[in-house]
Amino acid sequence: MSKIVKIIGREIIDSRGNPTVEAEVHLEGGFVGMAAAPSGASTGSREALELRDGDKSRFLGKGVTKAVAAVNGPIAQALIGKDAKDQAGIDKIMIDLDGTENKSKFGANAILAVSLANAKAAAAAKGMPLYEHIAELNGTPGKYSMPVPMMNIINGGEHADNNVDIQEFMIQPVGAKTVKEAIRMGSEVFHHLAKVLKAKGMNTAVGDEGGYAPNLGSNAEALAVIAEAVKAAGYELGKDITLAMDCAASEFYKDGKYVLAGEGNKAFTSEEFTHFLEELTKQYPIVSIEDGLDESDWDGFAYQTKFWRQNPAGCDDLFVTNTKILKEGIEKGIANSILIKFNQIGSLTETLAAIKMAKDAGYTAVISHRSGETEDATIADLAVGTAAGQIKTGSMSRSDRVAKYNQLIRIEEALGEKAPYNGRKEIKGQA
């Protein structure tokens, strides 16, 4: 009852008003899976290719009709009649048929949409939730945990039209007992942050990921106003809630220097910028820093990893959910945490392989959204089904972000004590 009988691809709209690929996979017995590919703003140069049409007369060149045609044409022809339960086999057929290193023939957006839709259809055919099916595909059946949210409540960099260099300032409700409580804590801090910003005469418009995007006097001021909001919400910073940042440093890396417009265009070397960030960690309980250097700055990352020792030095643009690059990073002692993004690699099977490699090496794996999202909440199921421990899916506004939090609430309700929320224990160096 899990044989594929029909595949449909279509062009839909993401949270930034740009087109993306949605796919449906239909099986015998009437089972259907549907999924959509997300899209990033600050992207690593070695990510799998997101295929765009380039026709400037339509969606300013960002249409995805070529990728949709690949879904409805060669991909559908190759997969009809195949067993959807064989996820690795389905993904291999698409990857081999594409035949390129970075999925540039069909587009990672086409392959990923079908890959995820196939997993959803197979789960439906097996009569189980997606997270349970993912746990089985991961080789860890019945082993679940609820992830600690990393809530991006101040947006900067490529995610906002403001003067803040660092792209994400996040809170982690590590003191919560359940993910539902963690989400409530995050919501309360988010609303108190609005009051803090308004009292200072600052803008409370939001960025791509639902966090506030005010103009600030410095990057450190973002941490200061968050600390004020945490206190106003009745929580203790460092105990109930810790902080995290995504620098997206590749976006302000110019001619071998890190140039911060928000710090008066001050330029830093790799070591100087590492120490700049270190000073922030001395002032605030920042327990995770992502993309603290440019993706090409391997020597700088090695220094940063050794310098910080216990705290997670996460890599997103550098590793791009790619096991070949991650393996090299592990061998060279680069970072100790990886961001997991489906569309950076382009299939569920390859995503699961990256999570396994990271965990086997003692790295933490943070399941992450992209700045261009849809209502698709698959990453919530991925985080629970792989017991990843942490999830990044934006702030407490915009339905494209909240959809993932709501799915986590539903999953926790269904699993109960089978999926513990481990809070601080999930954060490297904080257990």
UniProtKB/Swiss-Prot annotation:
InterPro entries, alphabetized: Enolase, Enolase-like_C_sf, Enolase-like_N, Enolase_C, Enolase_CS, Enolase_N
Positions of Mg(2+) binding: 246, 290, 316
Matching CDD domains: enolase (cd03313)
Catalytic activity: (2R)-2-phosphoglycerate = phosphoenolpyruvate + H2O
Broad enzyme group: lyase
SMART domains noted in UniProt: Enolase_C, Enolase_N
Primary residence: cytoplasm
GO terms for biological process, alphabetical: glycolytic process
GO cellular component, one term: extracellular region
Cofactor(s) essential for the protein: Mg(2+)
Free-text cofactor note: Binds a second Mg(2+) ion via substrate during catalysis.
Keywords of this entry: Cytoplasm, Glycolysis, Lyase, Magnesium, Metal-binding, Secreted
EC number of this enzyme: 4.2.1.11
Positions annotated as active site in the UniProt record: 209 (proton donor), 341 (proton acceptor)
Family that this chain belongs to: Belongs to the enolase family.
Quaternary structure and partners: Component of the RNA degradosome, a multiprotein complex involved in RNA processing and mRNA degradation.
Function of the molecule: Catalyzes the reversible conversion of 2-phosphoglycerate (2-PG) into phosphoenolpyruvate (PEP). It is essential for the degradation of carbohydrates via glycolysis.
Name this polypeptide is given: Enolase
